[in-house]
From Swiss-Prot:
Family listed: Belongs to the bacterial solute-binding protein 2 family.
Organism placement in taxonomy: Bacteria, Pseudomonadati, Pseudomonadota, Gammaproteobacteria, Enterobacterales
Binding partners and assembly: The complex is composed of two ATP-binding proteins (LsrA), two transmembrane proteins (LsrC and LsrD) and a solute-binding protein (LsrB).
Protein name, as recorded: Autoinducer 2-binding protein LsrB
Tagged with keyword Acetylation: no
Keywords: Periplasm, Signal
Taxonomic source organism: Photorhabdus temperata
Subcellular location: Periplasm
Length: 339
């Protein structure tokens, strides 16, 4: 009698292990940046991985070494083929990833975006640092805090002409300049393509080309420190350097007075929120406009309609979660942040 009982117990044990393995496999989330090796994205990845540990899900942070559609598509396809249940991606292009993402959704993978969006029909929820109006307004307000002249020359400098988020912010910033500072001349808009060396060369080129430039507006984690370094190299500390980057990267420029203020949001929290939302989708299936989610140590976030981003597309299970706050960093508050 003992042998059959032992066999049954062994079978139950094997089945239990199989079920446990299946549950863990169903809780794998991929978190993809535009590229690896940039502090901003690394910090977002750290937040994502930390949230995964809190929730008991497996989070993999990986991205291409250069910001390309092909690199991100390859990663997306790899994660789908490995059986990941959710993918959260900062898109290098609003349309370029869509075929791969739509294929993934047809296979049951939950697709979210963070930092930089795709077209909304190519994902479910976008974890958004701020609306174009909010972030474009921040850029102009930070510039106006330093450029007091009615007649001024400003340059825009960021990652690329195709990246979704930054182009939306810049479009709003330019509209705000036209409406509120009609005497400001936008002399150029240039790009560093997420390359530190090219970004520094481009920033120095802007400063050399316009000796009477009043401000560089650089809403990009590579472009802003490059603009600050270029101003130091060329001894052009009369130029207001504003934009978006991480406090740890920008702290030396703030301490030396090259930069007076710059902005961002808590990208670590953005990574955490992304994983909490992805996990909620895996648990419940959908989040719809008006739904709320309580996230420990962050607060309550809600799903807003795509229209807040200027989109016309609305659908069930589709919307935007906006981070609760954005931050302007100065000498007075920068040491409160470490990312």
């Amino acid at each position: 009698m003992k042998a059959p009982i032992l066999k049954k117990l062994a079978l139950i044990s094997v089945l239990s292990l199989a079920c446990t393995s299946w549950v863990h496999a169903a809780e794998r989330i991929a978190f993809i940046p535009k590229l690896v090796g940039v502090g901003f994205f690394t910090s977002g990845g750290q937040g994502a991985v930390a949230a995964g540990k809190t929730l008991g899900v497996s989070v993999t942070y990986d991205g291409p070494t250069e910001p390309s559609v092909a690199g991100q598509v390859q990663l997306i396809n790899n994660f789908v083929n490995q059986g990941y249940d959710a993918i959260v991606v900062s898109a290098v292009s609003p349309e370029g990833l869509c075929p791969a993402l739509k294929r993934a959704m047809k296979r049951g993978v939950k697709i979210l975006t963070w930092d930089s969006d795709t077209s909304p029909e190519c994902r479910s929820i976008y974890i958004n640092q701020g609306t174009p109006n909010q972030l474009g307004g921040m850029l102009v307000d930070m510039t106006a805090n330093q450029v007091k002249k009615e007649q001024a020359k400003v340059a825009f400098f960021y990652s690329s002409p195709t990246v979704t988020d930054q182009n939306q912010w810049v479009x709003q910033a330019k509209d705000k300049i036209a409406a509120e500072h009609p005497g400001w001349e936008i002399v150029t808009t240039q790009f560093g393509y997420n390359d530190a060396t090219k970004s520094l060369q481009t920033a120095e080129g802007i400063l050399n080309a316009w000796s009477d430039l009043d401000a560089i507006i650089a809403p990009d984690a590579n472009a802003l420190p490059a603009a600050a370094q270029a101003a130091e190299n060329l001894k052009r500390q009369d130029v207001a350097i504003v934009g978006f980057s991480t406090p740890n990267v920008m702290r030396p420029y703030l301490e030396r007075g090259t930069v007076k203020q710059f902005g961002l949001w808590d990208v670590v929290s953005q990574g955490k929120i992304s994983i909490h939302v992805a996990n909620e989708l895996l648990r419940k299936g959908d989040l719809n406009v008006g739904d709320k989610l309580d996230i420990p140590d962050i607060g309550t976030v809600a799903v807003a309609p795509n229209s807040i981003q200027g989109y016309s597309y609305e659908a069930k299970g589709n919307g935007i979660v906006v981070l609760p706050e954005r931050v302007i960093f100065t000498k007075d508050n920068i040491n409160q942040y470490d990312f």
